[in-house]
Structures are given as structure tokens and as C-alpha cells.
């Protein structure tokens, strides 16, 4: 299994650091005059060339904040990341990446109903599966962490495969108000793309009514494989479905230098939200920033 990186920029910087570590000269066997040890800041490569190639607004000092410090030792050993390990010399321990993570496997949640007998959840059948269509803000569904696009595998021990939307809502209506047990798979139709702003604060894409319509050549968006004809579901884990483009742009502007988008193909998205009013999406969808 290969080492994993959140973005192409992380991969390139990581490769430079590893290459420099491998190229470090070994200590001579015969005694020699000891030169003064270089400061830790010089143990990592000069990133001027890399900055020019990627258009990143980053310095060696900024990268080093996200790297493990090398101990002061005469027997320094440069280690390579293990298979499957996520290495992020540029992104670091970014909260947006953590909030947007689509976890593999399935999980169980316990849902209840509010005083009106509502869960705050709407479901939609897609390709014989059952998916979360709407999570209303400040409801039991939002409190347990359900998100748009999550797949519902079971409700109270009953397999949901093949159910239509009407049956799903009927089962929820009849379920206990105190405890509804669901088995969930995280957003199988969605994927995340992590990008880095350039010196002008741009990552290189534009949207129209929530859909990605263009990607700038040579930008971080292009380098990291962002595609057109996809809708933006989340920015750094925050749901933006139903928001005006101006508001989404504001969220992107204030989101920091590392941006993680959660996107979904247009054909799936439009099927998921059919018969939902744009006003309902805008005013009732949970747009809060999730906990990590």
C-alpha cells in the first residue's frame, strides 16, 4: 500500500523532504574536524523552486510547522512513512480535512424524535438504496451527525435495500419516539478533494448555482483532480447545499489556506434533491460546522 497524501502539493513537498533525507551524507569513519551543526530550519529543502512550480503561498517555516521535528542526535536516522500512512507536510492537521472525512465501513446510530414526533430527516431512494436527502438544522438527525448523501442500510434491524421513499418515511413515522436504530454508510456517492490557495487566495474553480462549471488550468483545483459537472456539498465539512453562490464564495474566502471540498456527480445530486424546494434546502438544511 502506498503512502497517502491529502493533496498533490503535500505529495510533492513530502517527496522533496524524503529525497533530501536520503541524499544526506553519512558520517566519515576517520576523525575529522567537527563543523557546527546546521539549525533545524536548514534540515529541510529550500522550497523556492517548488513554490514557483505550484504557485503556493508557503515558506519553509510554514511547512516545518507540520513536520515532526528531528531530534538532535549524532546518529540521526531518516525514516520513510509507512504504507497507508497519511502524510501532510503542507496541509498539516487541518480541521477541514478531518471534518470532511468520508469514513469506510458502516456504523450504528441511535436516533430519536423531538416533541413534535419529528426526526428532522428526509430520505430518497436511489438505485435500490436509501439515502439521506435532507437533514434539518437543530433536530435529532443533525445532532447524531447524519449528513446529506449518507446511505441508510437498516432501520430497527430491517434491511432498507429495495425500499421506495414512501415506505421509508412510513417506517420512520411508525418507529419509536425514544430510540430508532440505524446502520449507516458514509456518503458513498461523494468524494473529497483537498486544495491549497495560491498567493492571491484562489484555488482555481468557479460555481454556478452550486455546480462546478470551470476549473482553471494550472491551479490547485486542476492539479488535484477537481471535476466540472459536480455539485459542491461541503466546504471543509460544512454543508453548503442550497446556499447562494455568493454565500458559498464567502465561506471559501474565510476558510483558510487549505480547502477540502466534498463533491457529488450532477446526475446523482439532481436525482437526490428532486421534488425538494430550493427554499427548503436554503432555510432548513443543517449548514452548521460539524464537530471533529
Curated annotation (Swiss-Prot):
SMART domains, A to Z: PDZ (SM00228)
Annotated PDZ domain residues: 108-187, 192-267
Native source species: Mus musculus (Mouse)
UniProt protein name: Syntenin-2
Quaternary context: Monomer and homodimer. Interacts with SDCBP. Interacts with TM4SF1.
Gene Ontology biological process terms from the UniProt entry: cell population proliferation
Keyword match Transit peptide: no
Keywords: Cell membrane, Cytoplasm, Lipid-binding, Membrane, Nucleus, Repeat
Entry's localization field: Cytoplasm; Nucleus, Nucleolus; Nucleus, Nucleoplasm; Cell membrane
Disulfide bonds: none
Job of this protein: Binds phosphatidylinositol 4,5-bisphosphate (PIP2). May play a role in the organization of nuclear PIP2, cell division and cell survival.
Example of a GO MF term: protein heterodimerization activity
One Pfam family of this chain: PDZ
Entry comment, domain topic: The two PDZ domains mediate the interaction with phosphatidylinositol 4,5-bisphosphate (PIP2) and target SDCBP2 to the plasma membranes and nucleoli, PIP2-rich regions.
A GO cellular component annotation in the UniProt record: cytoplasm
Recorded superkingdom: Eukaryota
Coiled-coil annotated spans: none
